[in-house]
């Protein structure tokens, strides 16, 4: 059994019972008001703008900061694109083993997986999903969008889930550009993202096997070790999808499963144009530490 297959099997166990049925007696932690206060202080200390929403499925608590304000999706859209692919597989409209052959002309910047697979046998839809989610391969992300009709089709799928906020308008790499304040293109809010992740990973938007596969890809992500993952305590299982545009936007969305049961869903969007990548990572890691206490 391959590494991702083992992770999919493990992830499947996480959905054996509904999320709220796994609740344990609430451990000593921080209430929503204290969490909001800590997030506000983190933003003030770090500079820039920070949008966060946290949902603890074990106790039903929610907390956030600027959670209804819009931020650029950047590569966090790739988790949603992979989920839409899985929804289409569930409906018999797509097959994970469908193979696409492509050329050098299809490549865009940051394509660590696809650049090595030009010509020959190409890649399967499953491989594009894995590359897009676990290594944020931009060409893979574009092929996922192409597979179901482009950004507008992804937005329509999100609307069908009840997400009236998140929208995708462009493909990689243009979707990372933000022209001016008030530009709604390719944006989401932290609250909208958390609610959508809850439906995808713990609701009935996907079949059980597809929920497990999506979770497995998130758990296998290799780009988020210094972000939310770095803040959650040892022993927690974390799956995430990062997003970065290189000009001040740094994001991370995901879910963390504590050993005691339940799950914590987090979306964190950070806009700090004058700060370094290391600074962004530290801010997002602190969000993980705060989220674990809700």
In which residue ranges do the predicted regions lie?
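Twin-arginine (Tat) signal peptide motif
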Residues: 1-10, 21-24
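Beta-lactamase-like hydrolase cores
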Residues: 24-72, 290-293
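Structured C-terminal helix/loop/strand segments within mature extracytoplasmic catalytic/sensor domains
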Residues: 2-4, 14, 27-39, 146-147, ...
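Acidic helix-start/capping segments at beta-turn-to-alpha-helix junctions
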Residues: 57, 97-113, 148-149
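Mid-domain, small-residue-enriched loop/turn segments at the edges of structured enzyme/sensor domains
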Residues: 49, 142-205
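Conserved catalytic neighborhood of penicillin-recognizing serine enzymes
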Residues: 107-143, 151, 186
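Soluble periplasmic/extracytoplasmic beta-strand elements of cell-envelope proteins
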Residues: 51-56, 64, 80, 101, ...
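Active-site SXXK
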Residues: 60, 72-100, 266
């Amino acid at each position: 059994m391959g590494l991702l297959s083992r992770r999919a099997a493990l992830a499947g166990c996480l959905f054996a019972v509904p999320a709220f049925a796994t609740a344990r007696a609430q451990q000593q932690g921080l209430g929503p008001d204290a969490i909001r206060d800590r997030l506000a202080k983190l933003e003030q200390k770090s500079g820039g703008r920070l949008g966060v929403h946290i949902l603890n499925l074990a106790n039903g608590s929610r907390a956030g900061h600027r959670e209804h304000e819009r931020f650029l999706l950047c590569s966090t859209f790739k988790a949603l694109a992979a989920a839409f692919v899985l929804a289409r597989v569930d409906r018999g409209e797509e097959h994970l083993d469908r193979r696409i052959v492509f050329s050098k002309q299809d490549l865009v910047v940051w394509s660590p997986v696809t650049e090595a697979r030009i010509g020959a046998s190409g890649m399967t839809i499953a491989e594009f999903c894995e590359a897009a989610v676990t290594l944020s391969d931009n060409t893979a992300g574009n092929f996922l969008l192409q597979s179901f009709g482009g950004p507008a089709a992804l937005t329509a799928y999100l609307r069908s889930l009840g997400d009236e906020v998140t929208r995708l308008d462009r493909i990689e790499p243009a979707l990372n550009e933000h022209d001016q304040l008030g530009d709604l293109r390719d944006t989401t809010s932290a609250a909208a993202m958390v609610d959508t992740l809850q439906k995808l990973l713990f609701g009935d938007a996907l079949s059980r096997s597809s929920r497990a596969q999506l979770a497995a890809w998130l758990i296998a992500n290799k780009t988020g070790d210094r972000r939310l993952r770095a803040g959650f305590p040892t022993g927690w299982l974390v799956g995430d999808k990062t997003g970065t545009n290189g000009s001040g936007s740094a994001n991370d969305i995901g879910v963390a499963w504590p050993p005691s049961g339940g799950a914590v869903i987090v979306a964190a969007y950070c806009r700090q144009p004058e700060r370094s990548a290391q600074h962004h990572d530290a801010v997002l890691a602190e969000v993980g530490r705060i989220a674990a206490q809700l």
